[in-house]
Regions:
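Glyoxalase I/VOC metalloenzyme domain signal
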Residues: 1-76, 81-165
């Protein structure tokens, strides 16, 4: 329709943007020109991406990178049975870092691709009826996750619903 949209984009490190550290984007488009949710989307209990789970080959190196880049608080470190990984979650960042502890899909993926997102946790209003079926319950970083039945293209569930914090 000819409407001009603009944004600023920057990377925090060399290499492909958004692999280990996220790229930063600032939308300069006036809000009135941006897409607005309508219909069912306007009243949906789904709020958007809450947390990105990043698979890494070395937890300490990744934690140090995030702490330095974002002046982040010390993360909570736990083990995650769902991922077969040691994980670190920051109280002030929307990311969980996962370092595989045994063979499995996460170890294979990190070995093959290096540091990349491996799961996305979608924020949902606490107690709301989101309307999804065939969910599998699990947890990551001591947060309850309801995994959606989406497995394509990676062969396992990677989209999860979490109650907004």
């Amino acid at each position: 329709d000819g409407t001009l949209v603009e944004w600023d984009l920057t990377s925090l490190e060399d290499g492909d943007p958004g692999t280990r550290l996220p790229f930063l984007i600032a939308d300069r488009t006036p809000r009135e020109r941006r897409v607005q949710p309508t219909g069912d989307l306007a009243t949906s209990p789904i709020r958007g991406i809450d947390t990105v789970v990043l698979g890494v080959p070395d937890l300490t190196t990744a934690v140090d990178a995030f702490t330095t880049a974002f002046d982040a608080q010390e993360p909570t470190r736990t083990t995650c049975a769902d991922l077969h990984a040691d994980v670190a979650s920051f109280p002030d960042l929307p990311v969980v870092i996962a370092d595989p502890t045994e063979d499995g899909w996460l170890a294979e993926r990190v070995s093959r691709t290096g540091t990349l997102p491996v799961a996305y946790l979608i924020g949902c209003e606490r107690g709301a009826d989101h309307g999804f079926e065939n969910l599998t319950t699990g947890s990551i970083a001591d947060r309850s996750v309801e995994w959606l039945p989406v497995t394509h293209p990676v062969g396992h569930r990677y989209l999860g619903l979490v109650a907004e914090q």
